[in-house]
Curated annotation (Swiss-Prot):
Gene3D superfamilies: Cysteine-tRNA ligase, C-terminal anti-codon recognition domain (1.20.120.1910), HUPs (3.40.50.620). Belongs to the class-I aminoacyl-tRNA synthetase family. It comes from the Bacteria. It comes from Blochmanniella pennsylvanica (strain BPEN). GO terms for cellular component: cytosol. This is Cysteine--tRNA ligase. Binds 1 zinc ion per subunit. Keywords: Aminoacyl-tRNA synthetase, ATP-binding, Cytoplasm, Ligase, Metal-binding, Nucleotide-binding, Protein biosynthesis, Zinc. Its cofactor is Zn(2+). A motif ('KMSKS' region) lies at residues 270-274. It catalyses: tRNA(Cys) + L-cysteine + ATP = L-cysteinyl-tRNA(Cys) + AMP + diphosphate.
Amino acid sequence: MLKIFNTLTKKKEKFIPINAGKIKIYVCGVTVYDLCHLGHARTFIVFDSVIRYLRHCGYQVSYVRNITDIDDKIIKRAYENNETTQQLTNRMIQEMHLDLDALNILRPNYEPKVTEHIDIIIKFICLLISKKHAYTAPNGDIMFSVETMHNYGVLSNKENPPKIHDNILKIPNIKKNPMDFVLWKKTTYNNKLGEPCWSSPWGLGRPGWHIECSAMNYSIFGNQIDIHGGGSDLIFPHHDNEIAQSVCAHETSYANIWMHSGLLLLNYEKMSKSLNNFFTIRDILKHYDPETIRFFLMSAHYRSQLKYNDNNLKNAQTSLKRLYIALRDTNPTIQPNGGDNEGEYFISKFISKMNDDFNTPEAYSVLFDIAHRLNNLKIKGHSLLAQGMAATLKYLANIIGLLHQNPEIFLKKITLKHNKNRHFEKIQKLIQCREVARKNNQWELADSIRKKLTVMGITLEDGPTGITKWHFK
């Protein structure tokens, strides 16, 4: 029996779908104004493994991951780039798909855009107004009134409410309650910024952040879904506000289970564009195979925080390499079994770990037990048993999107990446030594380093500020 930790109840619960055999799941997507970073990748890989496992269990899963394609950050970035918001978002959506496809992340069944659901959003707001859960602020914005929701903040725990940011408290004339939030933002078309806006009963404007997910979710799935997911940074205010809007509008529980993935940390802080503390997926793909990144991002339990650093990625690559080495010289195309019911034992153990709130670290330990057994069988020359064990290893790893490559091809790829990374590190070290030599007026040494780099195919460009740029010839 599958058990899932529910953020709403703060405990693991037996998973019982609303409709037998079918699951409706909604995961909050990205705001498409820039390339996705590794923190986004962690959330999407977590839920990708969840969806793969649910489908393996025989469920018919309908998966929605939204796209926020209108937002202040989008408007600002489009203006800076001298392009329309639509040009920017269309380009970033394509880039997002390239990155997520590279990580073997399945595409959702539906990928709704905010700009394609404005009418639905307006109707949703009208319903909240008619039920007296929303009001017009003095500046023309439509606000949700949190005082009309008897248990507002239930997800983040209203007995210990999150700290209200100072900038919220500094707007006393706009909100009836400092926690009230925008449903519809009144705007006027700004030719300079090319700011998009839509007609509504309240004048020109655009939707607030929180209403978008409630409305799009409702338009696809109706009043209630099985699972709502996202990063733990969305618990408050986004998911608390989604619950408030949806429960007040339709008087249902909205989502039966709330799942949240832990944050990816860089320098002990959340990996985030707003903190300028991130690496893009594209950055990391230059140095590591996509499957290594996927393996790393599932190496901690999905609810736990995960620390990013180069050593942890290298360790993940070494671990994944061990599994592929075990698969070497096998042909795992036969049915998964290890003989003497070994295969069945490992399969049962793997399933029990995944049934315990999708415990991928424990599931990994089963994969390594299989790899160890497989290596022993190969050493002892039990080729038929080894083939069965290899099939079991590949079968189980495939459930969570791993070991889908040819072992020889994977091992050659990471060797090439490793050599390239070492070459890159050597170049950086030589350039740093040359910069020190120049600062110390050691011109002969600086020139000899330049010549060495030239032989390696590197062209240097010394800038007027003392910064040296380089590129391959």
